[in-house]
């Protein structure tokens, strides 16, 4: 494991870089991660600065992809005051107005949270690297945090049906992970959970919901491009995507999306 120093104002922190390993998003690709020394307990301001240069939190780890000759993991965020729902999002919003939202710190997690998480992984992600679920995995991934984190809960009467883990930042929220009742498929709870997080950011008068990484050629990550406008971290600058890309446009990006702005995007959809 090598020590690493990113080129940012955060050089007083210690970072490490992992050896190459199989990419979680793209077949036949290898990946490397830069991560903050987990001994650091970071505050909201530090996490916010890290997020603005492309880092993300998972459990006690704050990381950023640093892959050789591949730049397909693009940090993305939604400017909440400019966001407009599309037709499918409006339907999900209307369909779930019977749900009640509550906010609790992640350290207040109970067996109710874990049981919902366990069902979700077993029924929705049995083919993924998080299967089989365990209480230890749940606590390390979603309960433990090196910063200020909370659960945004959605309740149907007295039944918990959806939980989003969120990190508070000085300019918004970071959406860490969402899990929900697999029997409630018709509600589009994954969509509605993002819409509620966008609403919550507006209610506390902040600006952005960070959605992690948009990976254009990964089907499971491409849903993030439906939240428009979407800002992408390209070549060290946040650039705005003003409409959703079609599958044809995404396929035209080729095998290796770079951090510099594709020239055909400049006049067409980014300002």
Swiss-Prot record:
Cell location: Cytoplasm
Enzyme Commission code: 2.3.2.29
Domain of life: Bacteria
Chemical reaction(s) catalysed: N-terminal L-glutamyl-[protein] + L-leucyl-tRNA(Leu) = N-terminal L-leucyl-L-glutamyl-[protein] + tRNA(Leu) + H(+); N-terminal L-aspartyl-[protein] + L-leucyl-tRNA(Leu) = N-terminal L-leucyl-L-aspartyl-[protein] + tRNA(Leu) + H(+)
InterPro entries: Acyl_CoA_acyltransferase (IPR016181), Asp_Glu_LeuTrfase (IPR017138), N-end_Aminoacyl_Trfase (IPR030700), N-end_Aminoacyl_Trfase_C (IPR007472), N-end_Aminoacyl_Trfase_N (IPR007471)
Listed GO biological process terms: ubiquitin-dependent protein catabolic process via the N-end rule pathway
Single GO cellular component term: cytoplasm
Record keywords, A-Z: Acyltransferase, Cytoplasm, Transferase
Coiled-coil blocks: none
Acyltransferase listed as a keyword: yes
GO molecular function, one term: leucyl-tRNA--protein transferase activity
Role summary: Functions in the N-end rule pathway of protein degradation where it conjugates Leu from its aminoacyl-tRNA to the N-termini of proteins containing an N-terminal aspartate or glutamate.
Entry similarity comment: Belongs to the R-transferase family. Bpt subfamily.
NCBIfam families given in the database record: PRK01305.1-1, PRK01305.1-3, PRK01305.2-3
Family annotation (PANTHER family): ARGININE-TRNA-PROTEIN TRANSFERASE 1, ARGINYL-TRNA--PROTEIN TRANSFERASE 1
Protein name from the UniProt record: Aspartate/glutamate leucyltransferase
Biological source species: Acinetobacter baylyi (strain ATCC 33305 / BD413 / ADP1)
Gene: bpt
């Amino acid at each position: 494991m090598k020590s690493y120093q990113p080129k940012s104002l955060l050089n007083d922190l210690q970072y490490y870089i992992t050896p190459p390993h199989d990419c979680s998003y793209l077949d036949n690709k290898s990946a490397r991660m830069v991560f903050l020394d987990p001994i650091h307990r970071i505050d909201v301001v530090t996490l916010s600065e890290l997020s603005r240069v492309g880092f993300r939190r998972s459990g006690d780890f704050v990381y950023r992809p640093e892959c050789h000759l591949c730049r397909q993991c693009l940090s993305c965020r939604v400017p909440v005051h400019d966001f407009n729902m599309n037709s499918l999002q409006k339907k999900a919003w209307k369909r779930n107005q019977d749900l009640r939202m509550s906010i609790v710190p992640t350290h207040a997690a109970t067996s109710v949270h874990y049981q919902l998480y366990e069902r979700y992984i077993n029924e929705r992600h049995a083919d993924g690297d998080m299967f089989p679920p365990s209480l230890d995995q749940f606590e390390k991934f979603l309960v433990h945090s090196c910063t200020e984190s909370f659960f945004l809960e959605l309740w149907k009467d007295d039944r918990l049906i959806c939980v989003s883990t969120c990190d508070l930042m000085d300019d918004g929220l970071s959406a860490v992970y969402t899990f929900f009742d697999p029997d409630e498929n018709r509600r589009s709870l994954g969509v509605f959970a993002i819409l509620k997080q966008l609403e919550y950011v507006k209610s506390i008068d902040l600006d952005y919901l960070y959605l992690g990484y948009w990976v254009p050629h990964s089907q499971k990550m491409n849903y993030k491009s439906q939240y428009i406008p979407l800002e992408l971290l390209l070549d060290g600058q946040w650039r705005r995507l003003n409409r959703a890309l079609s599958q044809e446009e995404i396929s035209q990006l080729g095998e290796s999306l770079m951090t510099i702005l594709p020239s055909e995007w400049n006049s067409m959809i980014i300002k």
